[in-house]
């Protein structure tokens, strides 16, 4: 989520929204398709640590989940705040917040969609960097061990280590990612797919740039997963500085080229990739065409891409946010036209996508 978006939300989130609860569940799903075609349903990462449910933050409603399931999306990337789920480092998870997380997961499962758990913290806890004295790697590993135990070996739940590590040395982030992954595989005994970002907001366009030490593309090649079931997560926007804040698509060709270059890196190293965030305004043909071009890169290279989740939607998103594809009273947002071919065409099902354990 961008700085601009956070400012909009801070002003807009003044009223609570009641969550629609669903008690229905289904047995652990063998996913309908082998590739993720998903949506970020934002809301549980809103506000400050603590906060009141349905006043300061919310989890996705039944209405919203059902809408995106009806459009063919098969995955929800589910952002939330680490500090709410674990109010004290190295201590048990908060029972009430775990309950809300579980309700959201079951609500999504009821529509036969997968869930990506996304601590949306930019490699920070209460403002302090992971791998620092105040938030040591052991604390990050402890958090993931506790969280992973909730869904260990339930393969419709995927573990996204962290949203957009930012302004953190790559060596520091790599150590933290390795320790968290070791805890997931060891202490939690979980073999779920893990999504691993780089630093510098994990941009595809900057994957080979030495921004915080070595380039992501050099350092993250040393990432270690004892379970060997992971994919590298990148984000990519199309505006002037690739931040998603400028409400234009001036760098659309560069954004598509960035995904193509990342595809080559994945293939060269024998890795899998995942496009966790991408989005653009819906009011211009150029933007719609560029979004489709980005989706096409992932769909045309299923030997290395596990799929994508569009940013953004959610019950509390303001209608003025141009990347938002939460439906309006008038109907669908125009960006769906770029995503629809991939949502409806599953002709390659089971053939070309990397297998998910």
Describe these PLM feature segments.
Residues 28-30:
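Boundary of Sec targeting at the N-terminus
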């Amino acid at each position: 989520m961008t700085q601009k978006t956070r400012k909009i939300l801070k002003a807009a989130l003044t009223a609570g929204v009641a969550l629609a609860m669903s008690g229905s569940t289904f047995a652990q799903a063998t996913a309908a398709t082998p590739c993720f075609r998903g949506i970020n349903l934002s809301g549980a990462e809103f506000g400050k640590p603590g906060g009141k449910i349905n006043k300061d933050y919310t989890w996705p409603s039944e209405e919203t989940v059902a809408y995106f399931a009806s459009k063919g999306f098969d995955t929800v990337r589910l952002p939330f705040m680490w500090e709410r789920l674990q109010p004290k480092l190295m201590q048990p998870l908060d029972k009430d917040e775990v309950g809300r997380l579980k309700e959201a997961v079951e609500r999504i499962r009821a529509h036969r969609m997968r869930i990506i758990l996304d601590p949306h913290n930019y490699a920070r806890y209460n403002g302090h960097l992971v791998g620092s004295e105040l938030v040591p790697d052991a604390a990050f590993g402890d958090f993931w061990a506790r969280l992973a135990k909730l869904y260990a070996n339930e393969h419709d739940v995927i573990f996204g280590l962290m949203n957009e590590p930012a302004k953190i040395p790559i060596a520091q982030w790599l150590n933290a990612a390795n320790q968290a992954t070791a805890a997931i595989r060891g202490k939690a005994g979980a073999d779920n797919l893990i999504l691993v970002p780089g630093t510098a907001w994990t941009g595809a366009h900057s994957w080979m740039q030495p921004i915080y030490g070595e380039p992501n593309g050099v350092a993250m090649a040393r990432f270690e997963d004892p379970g060997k079931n992971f994919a590298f997560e990148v984000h990519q926007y199309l505006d002037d500085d690739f931040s998603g804040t400028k409400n234009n698509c001036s760098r659309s060709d560069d954004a598509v080229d960035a995904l193509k270059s990342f595809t080559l890196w994945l293939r060269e190293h024998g890795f899998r990739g995942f496009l966790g965030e991408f989005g653009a305004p819906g009011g211009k043909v150029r933007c719609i065409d560029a979004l489709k071009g980005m989706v096409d890169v992932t769909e045309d290279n299923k030997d290395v891409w596990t799929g994508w989740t569009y940013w953004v939607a959610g019950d509390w998103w303001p209608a003025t946010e141009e990347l938002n594809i939460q439906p309006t009273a008038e109907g669908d947002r125009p960006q769906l036209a770029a995503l629809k071919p991939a949502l409806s065409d599953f002709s390659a099902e089971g053939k070309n996508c990397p297998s998910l354990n």
